[in-house]
C-alpha cells in the first residue's frame, strides 16, 4: 500500500507545474481526480488509507507511521498551495485544514460514481473537479 500511495503522490506532484496558487490548485485537483479515475481498483485501497482510520490503525505501528508520512506529504503540498493563495489574496477560506480535507474528500470520491462508458471523459471530469476546488476557495472558475 505504501508504494501505491507514494506513486499517487509522485504522479500528482509531477503534474503540478504552475507557479501561481490557483493554477497549482487546479492542477492538483485535476491530477488527483484523473489518477483515481485511471486506477479505480487502487482508489478503493486508498479509501482505506485516507478514510477508514480503523483499518489503518490495525496495521503494525511501523506501517502506520509510513502511511501517515506519505499522507502528510500530499496534505502538506495541498496546504502549501492553499496558504500561498490566501497570502496572495487569491483565495478566501475560513480554515486551511478543513479546506484541505474537503478538497481531498471531493477529489477522492470521483471514482465512486464515474462510468468510463458514460458520456464524460476522464479529462472532462478532472476539469470540473478543478473548478469545484477553485470554487471552494472562492477563486475564479476557468474561462472557456
Q: Would you name each region that the model predicts?
A:
Residues 12-16, 46-54, 114-117:
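Secondary-structure edge/capping motif, primarily at the C-terminal ends of alpha-helices
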Residues 38-62:
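Amphipathic alpha-helical segments used for helix-helix packing
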Residues 6, 13, 56-87, 97-101:
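Amphipathic alpha-helical packing segments from all-alpha helical-bundle domains
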Residues 20-24, 98:
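A conserved beta-strand->loop->alpha-helix hinge within the catalytic CA
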Residues 1-15, 23, 27-34, 38, ...:
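Alpha-helical structural segments
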Residues 30-35, 72-88, 104-144:
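C-terminal peripheral helix-coil segments that are non-catalytic and often amphipathic
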Residues 44-47, 94, 144:
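Short, hydrophobic secondary-structure boundary micro-motifs
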